[in-house]
Structure formats: C-alpha cells, structure tokens
Amino acid sequence: MNDPTIAIEIETTSSTKRVGLLGVLTLLAITAAAILHVNQPEFILDRFEGISELEYSLFDTTLYSSYLIIGITTGLLSDRWAKRRVFVLVGATGSILFYWLMTTTLSYPILLLYRFLQGSFTVMAWQTFMTLAIDFSESHNRGRNMGIFGAFLALAMGLGPAVGGVIASFGVFIPYYTAMGLNVLVLTIGLVALRDPPMTKTRPTLKQSFMLARTSPELIVPGIFNLFDRLHIGFILTALPFFLSTMLGLDESLRGLSLAIFALPFIILQYPMGKLSDRYGRFRQLVVGSIGYGVVLSVVGIVGLLGFNLLLVMLAILGLFSGVTSPPAMALIGDIVGQEDSAMGMGFFNFLGNLGITIGPILFGVIMPILGMSNAFVVVGLLELATLVVNILLVRTVFKDRIT
C-alpha cells in the first residue's frame, strides 16, 4: 500500500500548491516595485528642481544597489537562522512604510535614502519567496516548480509598467499608494497562509560561488552575458521613460504601454527559446540574439525621434532579441557546472546580473549629458556588440570545445 510513486505524486501536488502561493506573492511584490518606473520623470523632475541627469539616474541605481547588498545579506541570515517567514513579514511591512515615506519628503538625498530602504525591504521579501520555492522542491519536481515561479515573476515584470502607466494618470503618488496596497496583501497572505518549511536548504555563500568560478572558469561566459544584459535592462528602465517624457512629451499611460511592449516578447519567448537552445545549442543562439539586440538598441534613440509608432516596433523587436538570449545564458550554467553545483553557479550568475542592473542607470546619467539621448542608446548598443566579441574570442580560444 505504501506505493512510493503515489507518495511522490501527493508531495508534488502539495509542493506545487505552495510554489503557486509563492508565485502569487511574488507577482504582488514585484508588480508593486515595477509600477513606479513609468512616472519617474513627474515624481522626480517635477518635485525637485535642478536635478541633473546623473542625479535622476541615482533613483534607480540606489534601488538596485540595495538589491545587490541586501539580497546577499538576506540569504546568509535566513540560512543561518533557518527562518524564512519572518523575512517576508518584515520585508512587506518595511516596503509599505517606505513606499509611503517617499511621497512625503521634499529633500532629494532623503528620497534616495528612503529608496534604498524600500529596495532593501522589497528584496528581503521576494528573494525569500525564491528561496522558499527551492525549499519546497525536490529533484523530481524542481524544474516544474521553477517554471511556475518564473512565470509569475515574468508576468509581474511585464504587468507592472502597463498598470503603472494607467494608474499614474490619476496622480503622481497613486503608483506609490498602490504599491503600499499590494504589500498589505503580501503581509496579510503571509500572516495567514505562509509557514516555514520543516527543513530549510542552505544556499551557497557568495564566496563559495566565486570559488566555483575558479574551478569552472567557463562560467565567465554566461556571467558576462548576464552582466551586460541586466546592465541594459537597468539602462532602459531609467532612460526610456525619461526619453518618452522629455523628448516625445508622452504621458504616463503611453510610457507604460511602451515598457509593456518591450517586456511582452521577452515573457512569451522564455519557454520556447529554452527548448530551442536544448536542441541547437546555447552559444549560437546567444550570438544571434546579442547581435540583434545590440544593433536594435543602437538605433532605438534615433528611430524614436521619427515617431512613436516606429519606436514601438523597435521596442517589440528589442524585447524579442532579449527573449532569445536570456534562457540559453541561464541554461549554460547548468551545462557547465552540473546539477550538484547549480546553486553556486546561479549565485555567481545572479551576482553579476545584479551588478549590471546597478551600473545601467549610472551609465545613462553619465553618458546622456555628454553625448545626448540618442547617442546614449548607440553607446550601450555598441557595448553589447563589443562584449559579444569578447565572449566569441573566449569560446573559440580559451574555452574551445567546452561551450557549445
């Protein structure tokens, strides 16, 4: 009667429900953060006079730096204390507080402090959701559970800007109040439905992840791809709303539409592009996607000045190439290190990605005043192509026949 197959099926169903709940919580938390990007020009430039492009870019750089620093700290503490739920509850509560405080200050340095703290509490919650998804998964259901979790995460990234564009038209602070409400839901659901797992799985430390890069130096190839892909995401999330507002004079709803059109192909292509890379190889797909992404990104600023409709077409194509490159870069980690070291490999991969998305807004703030808006897109597009050349040289010389 004690059929192990039935036991596995029951456990799989139970863990899938838990991961589904974590996915919903992630959808709420990430959507809350994503809806703020669309009306940043009004929220910052209209409230704080004399803000330079570099100072403007610090609003997002501060957020991503908190993700980089507190994300690591949260992982270490949650493993050491073998606790998860408390980080979700504290994270949601802190997010509510600092989303509100950002609407109250008229000092830009204080706003940046609140932004850092808001990001710290936000990443505390959603990174714990990701850790819990791993805790509730075993080898026989990990792939499916990560697919479910990833679908909610991607949906939030695409849904946030679209929703933000609509609600921002009702008032500059409405996205922030909405973010507070979404985190109230996270806090309530966390209190009622979330429990710590009976056994927690220890995640690798950052030091362990970088030690793995010494024994498996091929990791630098997907790491470079992720570093610059995320750098471009950070650049686009800062530069595009600014460009649409100051250069084209578009309102919040159209800015939200633009970001959603960029995100939609990326979301849709995650699964099919992953399957395609299984069949035809990772690196070839990364080369094709990176060439297309770099070329299109280079001309976005120029084409955008010719008309909004043309810009939307270019953003859709850009999102398509972004969707082509993301799955094979992540899959390369598993190819290189194997399942037993995949967590450490992903730690290295994600650290470089978080570093890239932190640098992206700063790059916009530095380049734009010197070269202008359109040329800033040219520079970051050429940067994509230059890093692709570096990776091609690495794969054909240093790592020949070790990456396909």
Where is each model-derived feature located?
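Paired small-residue
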Residues: 109-117, 309-317
